Amino acid sequence: MKQSIIRAVFGCISLISASLMAQTPIVAPIALNNTAVNSDNNTKSNQVIFIVRHAEKFAGKDPSLSAQGQLRALRLAKVLSSTHLDKVYTTDYNRTRETATAVTQDQQVDLSVYDPRDMAAFTQHLLTQQGNILVVGHSNTSTDLVEGLGAEKQIPIADASEFDRLYIVTLNANKQMVSTVLLRY
């Protein structure tokens, strides 16, 4: 317990330092208590799905992350460092895989690929999975996924300039949405 608190504090300190140097908004590492009590007073686990758009990229057909994008990918790993992830999904593009790399290395979890052309099928697949999940997508898929999991209509992501949304969708044991939170990282 003490070690996790100390890790969270040091994670916050390094995140604050990096944010001050980069002049970006500060989002602290997220630590989740994944239990909820249902109406029968039985404890059941919630599932948390984190959804982000890939970080900043170079131009081109299948570009890699820019230097700013690489920093944002590291920031994402810091933000999620206090939360155990069971699965990480990306599309089969350099920019999404590179955004998830620091997280998969830090969490020692494998990366799985999904097809962004069939978000309905992927959403249904997510609902069959257990544990906490990170999904790295695109400006035209991230909000669709959030809505597909039960959230209200989302404001579209500004394609050229918006890379900092972190949606946190919490589902109960019956796979019903409990809450949706939008953070900036």
Language-model features and meaning:
Residues 132-134:
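Short SAM/SAH-binding signature in class I
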Residues 24-126, 130, 142-185:
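Active-site-proximal alpha-helix that buttresses catalytic centers in soluble enzyme cores
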Residues 1-12:
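Bacterial N-terminal signal peptides that target proteins for export
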Residues 136-138:
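Short beta-strand segments
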